[in-house]
């Protein structure tokens, strides 16, 4: 039979006089003063008021948790019992009528007593049951600031009578006169992971008798922040477990588990315990790294990062990339602890699982990085508190939107709005074919968003596919967590390859077409997320690595070289490859995924400018006012200047307006050389400039441009029997010769953007009418469609335009805006 114990392995450098001051004393005899609500009666003695030294309701004789404060779900008044025996019929050794019995083993939490002053002999006594893994279940003595002064566990635990209460005495005399509280902590969900207790007596004139077991102080080793180095002692296990503390069963973490700098306890995966590092001060960039494997059961095997003194958990994670086929191999992880710079922390590796692969492999811990790791891709450690156990329900959002839907009288509008609003989440049915929702959720809190009929995630599309949900982040945590998870996935994919536009679910590249909007859209979504939620946690070191990757890529493409990126295949023979660097950012492809004719795509440059300006504002708001903010501001300003210099034309009919693409050679506003005049459906587009944030809707250059793109002078503006709108060279309806005015092929998304950028109510309503009546009887939006025959369309399953339509209808027609008040 295994017995719980506390084993300390540490170097002499940590055995300071400050720590020795908390040593436990043994021997001697005394009587206890129980206070009015404990069962024992003190002997006659001089009348001295001991009220200040006595815990209130220390024996739970009130029949509840009066004078105690519970946090979490591990402790409740329902756990207070007057039963005389345990669940298995054995004597429980309680005192008086009541005690706190076994309760909610699978829950975590804490229970804190009233304040009392340490006095008399400094000894206290108590009874403990359960709590086999003393690294996770224990009794702390804390001061008013929650700093831990002492820690005791049920070190005499016996599995055969696990619930039986065992009597302990503890010497607190080294903290004589301090006001303190008792805090029962239960961080265990299994393996006798509960605490039962009774009869807390906190004042004795002399040391209690030898009948009590002397409780051993097992708190983490810590002196002060000033005395704490920035590195962990023996982080590479070169000296066995010197500097490390272990708790739990003796064979859970042992020197025998170390080989070649790696600790792996797989050989004893049936044992449970905790491995605790020496304290370290967060320094440098605040990033730490380690290699971690196994941890197959994240609720029981994980890494916990805690504050020294208070033991507040600031981060919990596991090896989410590990698979059974990896065996004892480890994966590299980086964790961002920069918000705790200057503070002392420690690491706890928790193994509370007896199941197969319920083990931990660990190596290569590094707690000091003076520079951010530039090679970072998907090696970020995710906090388990954001782990998505189940698919989110979006209950609050659905309740609001379903109310809107039920009030729509027009059947076609009602069906179309419902289908398009929920398309990203739930999918829809078209012509007898069921299409599922496009979001996939991961345990690490990230989310992947398919584009629809293509099994890949576009950085651009995925940002727009959640547009209709964004305002609900204000009231629905599921929406908030999904968008947060989507952003984290986008950041990861950008770090993998900033030139790629689409990725497979496993992180590999689906398509590598360099498009400016692939970098601008995630920045746009980032600002939306922050403005609505106020959550700045994701703007950590890993975000800065991502932003640096984006800025470096954009800066390089202002001086484009094929050595950085080159157009390959037959696309290189399309358009004009010659260009002149002029301060604009080079782009290989448009948001349609078609190759650019001229390589400076003006709407894409506009989007980059507005996205960077927003990021500068965000960085200021979250206090990141360093070099990276200055780089973003400088790039945005210079590109804006270049757009207004090289991207404009004084049209004889429309006046000063923006070009669609330019080659950078012509700054003459009255010349058309090297300039392409058109607009296309995919976004970013010229008509979308105010929606992108580049200019106001009443900006005169935009007003002139809008008049052009919504006229027959735009070669891709189509007028048909059922509707009119902007199309795109990238269409699969009509002939292959573009443009084809004989077969008018507008896109739903361009009509939606026309409505979103309009201030004319009649125009907005007309756009919605056009879209609602041209679904070809499918009640969802498509890509291109024949304006003379809406049943002739491309792409049944394309959720991007669905999101635009739903957002337009919800905000501009029904006026639902949770962000205004």
Q: Which residues does each predicted region cover?
A:
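Low-complexity, Ser/Thr/Pro/Gly-enriched N-terminal "stalk/linker" regions
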Residues: 30-31, 375-460
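Extended ligand-binding clefts on enzyme/binding-domain cores
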Residues: 459, 492-499, 503, 552-609, ...
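Aromatic-rich carbohydrate-recognition surfaces in CAZymes
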Residues: 455-570, 798-815
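Extracellular carbohydrate recognition and processing domains
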Residues: 144-180, 185-195, 310-345, 350-360
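Extracellular glycan-recognition surfaces and repeat-rich motifs
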Residues: 64-98, 233-263
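Short beta-strands within extracellular/lumenal beta-sheet-rich domains
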Residues: 97-123, 136, 166-168, 262-287, ...
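C-terminal capping/lid segments that line or modulate ligand- or cofactor-binding pockets
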Residues: 512-514, 522, 676-696, 742-821
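Extended, low-complexity, turn-rich repeat/linker tracts enriched in Gly/Pro/Ser/Thr and Asp/Glu
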Residues: 119-120, 130-137, 190-191, 283-284, ...
């Amino acid at each position: 039979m295994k017995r719980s114990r506390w084993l300390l392995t540490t170097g002499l450098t940590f055995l300071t006089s400050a720590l020795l001051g908390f040593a436990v004393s043994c021997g001697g005899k005394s009587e206890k003063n129980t206070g009015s609500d404990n069962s024992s009666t003190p002997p006659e003695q001089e009348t001295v008021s001991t009220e200040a030294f006595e815990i209130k309701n220390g024996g739970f004789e009130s029949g509840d948790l009066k004078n105690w404060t519970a946090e979490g779900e591990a402790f409740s008044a329902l756990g207070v019992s007057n039963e005389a025996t345990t669940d298995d019929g054995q004597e429980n050794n309680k005192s008086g009528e009541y005690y706190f019995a076994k309760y909610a083993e699978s829950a975590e939490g804490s229970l804190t007593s009233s304040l009392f002053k340490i006095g008399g002999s400094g000894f206290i006594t108590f009874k403990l049951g359960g709590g086999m893994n003393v690294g996770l279940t224990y009794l702390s003595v804390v001061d008013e600031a929650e700093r831990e002064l002492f820690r005791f566990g049920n070190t005499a635990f016996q599995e055969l009578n696990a619930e039986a209460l065992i009597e302990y005495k503890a010497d607190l005399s080294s903290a004589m006169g301090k006001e303190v509280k008792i805090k029962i902590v239960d961080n265990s969900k299994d393996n006798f992971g509960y605490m039962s207790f009774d009869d807390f007596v906190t004042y004795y004139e002399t040391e209690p008798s030898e009948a009590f077991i002397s409780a051993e102080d097992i708190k983490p080793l810590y002196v002060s922040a000033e005395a704490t180095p920035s590195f962990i002692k023996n982080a590479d296990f070169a000296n066995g477990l010197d500097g490390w503390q272990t708790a739990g069963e003796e064979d859970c973490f042992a020197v025998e588990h170390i080989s070649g700098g790696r600790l792996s306890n797989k050989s004893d995966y049936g044992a449970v315990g905790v491995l605790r590092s020496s304290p370290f001060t967060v320094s440098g960039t605040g990033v730490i790294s380690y290699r971690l494997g196994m941890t197959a059961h994240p609720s029981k095997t994980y890494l916990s990062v805690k504050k020294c003194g208070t033991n507040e958990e600031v981060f919990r994670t596991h090896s989410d990339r590990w698979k059974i086929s990896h065996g004892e191999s480890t994966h590299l992880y980086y964790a961002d602890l920069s918000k705790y710079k200057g503070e002392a922390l420690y690491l706890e590796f928790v193994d509370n699982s007896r199941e197969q692969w319920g083990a931990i492999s660990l190596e290569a811990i590094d707690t000091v990085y003076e520079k951010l790791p530039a090679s970072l891709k998907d090696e970020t450690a995710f906090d388990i508190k954001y782990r998505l156990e189940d698919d989110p329900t979006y209950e609050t959002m659905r309740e609001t939107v379903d109310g809107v839907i039920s009030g729509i009288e027009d059947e076609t509008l009602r069906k179309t709005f419902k289908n398009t609003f929920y398309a990203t989440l739930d999918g829809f049915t078209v012509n007898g074919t069921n299409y599922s929702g496009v979001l996939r959720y991961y345990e690490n809190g990230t989310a992947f968003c398919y584009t629809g009929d293509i099994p890949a995630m576009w950085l651009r599309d995925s940002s727009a596919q959640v547009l209709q949900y964004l305002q609900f982040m204000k009231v629905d945590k599921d929406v908030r967590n999904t968008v947060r998870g989507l952003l984290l996935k986008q950041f990861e994919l950008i770090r993998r390859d900033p030139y790629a536009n689409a990725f497979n679910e496993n992180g590999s590249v689906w398509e590598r077409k360099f498009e400016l909007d692939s970098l601008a859209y995630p920045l746009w979504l980032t600002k939306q997320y922050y403005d609505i939620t106020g959550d700045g946690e994701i703007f950590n070191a890993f975000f800065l690595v991502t932003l640096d990757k984006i800025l470096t890529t954009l800066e390089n493409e202002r001086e484009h070289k094929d050595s950085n990126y080159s157009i390959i295949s037959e696309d290189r023979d399309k358009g004009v490859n010659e260009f002149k660097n002029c301060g604009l950012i080079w782009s290989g492809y448009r948001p349609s995924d078609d190759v650019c004719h001229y390589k400076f795509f003006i709407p894409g440059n506009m989007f980059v400018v507005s996205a960077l300006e927003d990021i500068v504002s965000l960085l200021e708001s979250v206090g990141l006012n360093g070099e990276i903010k200055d780089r973003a501001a400088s790039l945005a300003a210079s590109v804006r200047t270049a757009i207004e210099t090289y991207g404009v034309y004084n049209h004889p009919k429309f006046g000063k307006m923006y070009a669609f693409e330019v080659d950078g050679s012509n700054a003459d506003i009255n010349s058309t050389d090297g300039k392409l005049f058109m607009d296309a459906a995919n976004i970013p587009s010229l008509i979308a400039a105010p929606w992108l944030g580049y200019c106001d809707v009443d900006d005169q250059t935009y007003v002139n441009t809008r008049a052009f793109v919504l006229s027959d002078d735009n070669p891709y503006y189509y007028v048909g029997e059922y509707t009119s709108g902007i199309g795109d060279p990238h269409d699969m309806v009509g002939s292959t010769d573009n443009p084809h005015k004989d077969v008018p092929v507008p896109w739903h998304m361009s009509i939606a953007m026309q409505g979103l950028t309009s201030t004319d109510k009649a125009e907005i309503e007309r756009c919605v009418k056009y879209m609602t009546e041209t679904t070809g009887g499918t009640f969802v939006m498509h890509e291109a469609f024949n304006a003379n025959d809406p049943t002739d369309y491309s792409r049944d399953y394309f959720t991007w335009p669905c999101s635009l339509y739903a957002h337009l209808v919800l905000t501009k027609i029904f006026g639902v805006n949770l962000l205004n008040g």
